[in-house]
């Protein structure tokens, strides 16, 4: 996937086009003073990210406390 990069001034001046690019073409990196500052992604992509993050957090909790939780559930 190609990630477009624009500087802050360009992003601000062309916000609608940058947002459309994030929705239809993939993530857009915003730079400030030559350094990566932020990434704009579509709402759909953000939801997938959030779901994956919650799945990872749940797996980590279960790895640490899974046995205790199963024992409590069996009581």
UniProtKB/Swiss-Prot annotation:
One of its GO terms (biological process) is regulation of DNA-templated transcription. InterPro entries: Antitoxin_Phd/YefM, phD/YefM_antitoxin, YefM-like_sf. GO terms for cellular component: protein-DNA complex. It comes from the Bacteria. Keywords: Toxin-antitoxin system. Pfam families: PhdYeFM_antitox. One of its GO terms (molecular function) is sequence-specific DNA binding. Putative antitoxin component of a toxin-antitoxin (TA) system; its cognate toxin is unknown. Belongs to the phD/YefM antitoxin family. This is Orphan antitoxin YefM.
